Amino acid sequence: MSEMLVLDGLTKAYNRGRPGEVTVLRGATLSVGTGEVVALVAPSGAGKSTLLHIAGLLDTPDEGRVAIGGTEMAGLGDRARTGTRRREVGFIYQFHHLLPEFTALENVVLPQLANGVSRRGAEARARDLLGRVGVGAREGHRPAALSGGEQQRVAFCRALANAPRLLLADEPTGNLDPGTSDQVFGVLMDLVRGTGLSALIATHNLELAARMDRVVRLEAGRVV
């Protein structure tokens, strides 16, 4: 299996060299194979959000290397890194962060327009994705008119709008009640499997973690 994501020896500290320095990652190393879904299990404060931000090129490590799809990120300038992030990586967070003034459809269309997709093509893909997660009939509703589970399904579609090869998710169902969480996670897994994505999904829920291909644990900034 080829590797879609490689994180090798990541170290990250905030306020480095100053009073109040906090080391968040201490040589964290992991990989995600092509088409593999990996659970990242970590207690609060272990550094999982920082690790995901570095993996998604939203932050840089103090030490260590990041490779996406076989390309080393260290040699890329800011513009190239931004382009790689937009093309290759989709993000899902615990809270949906949908734009409240736009409909469900527009929330999935807009990221595509920003990447140069025609409106016609963007709307067609958005409708396909919304239909696949069971909220196609709600495409004209704004986020406030949707249930929590529906909002998160739209967020899944937005994350996949530009057909990334790598999905990073930080507690994607953590804001939902247990019953809804289980159902919505099933929708996410069907979507990931159906598109052949590689995914690194952080969760506290060991039952959800067990449904993925492999589980890695992050403790005190280290993968154990």
Swiss-Prot record:
Top class in the EC scheme: translocase
Record EC number: 7.6.2.-
Membrane topology per record: Peripheral membrane protein
Binding site residues for ATP: A42, P43, S44, G45, A46, G47, K48, S49
InterPro entries in UniProt: AAA+_ATPase (IPR003593), ABC_transporter-like_ATP-bd (IPR003439), ABC_transporter-like_CS (IPR017871), ABC_transpr_LolD-like (IPR015854), MacB-like_ATP-bd (IPR017911), P-loop_NTPase (IPR027417)
Keyword set, alphabetical order: ATP-binding, Cell inner membrane, Cell membrane, Membrane, Nucleotide-binding, Translocase, Transport
GO molecular-function terms, A-Z: ATP binding; ATP hydrolysis activity; transmembrane transporter activity
Annotated GO biological process: lipoprotein localization to outer membrane; protein localization to outer membrane
UniProt-annotated location(s): Cell inner membrane
Cited SUPFAM superfamilies: P-loop containing nucleoside triphosphate hydrolases
Keyword field contains Translocase: yes
GO CC annotation, single: plasma membrane
SMART domains in the record: AAA
Pfam family, one: ABC_tran
Annotated ranges, domain ABC transporter: 5-224
Keyword 4Fe-4S tagged: no
Family listed: Belongs to the ABC transporter superfamily. Lipoprotein translocase (TC 3.A.1.125) family.
Assembly, per entry: The complex is composed of two ATP-binding proteins (LolD) and two transmembrane proteins (LolC and LolE).
The protein's role, per its UniProt record: Part of the ABC transporter complex LolCDE involved in the translocation of mature outer membrane-directed lipoproteins, from the inner membrane to the periplasmic chaperone, LolA. Responsible for the formation of the LolA-lipoprotein complex in an ATP-dependent manner.
PANTHER family according to UniProt: IMPORT ATP-BINDING PROTEIN, LIPOPROTEIN-RELEASING SYSTEM ATP-BINDING PROTEIN LOLD
Protein name: Lipoprotein-releasing system ATP-binding protein LolD
Species annotation: Cereibacter sphaeroides (strain ATCC 17023 / DSM 158 / JCM 6121 / CCUG 31486 / LMG 2827 / NBRC 12203 / NCIMB 8253 / ATH 2.4.1.) (Rhodobacter sphaeroides)
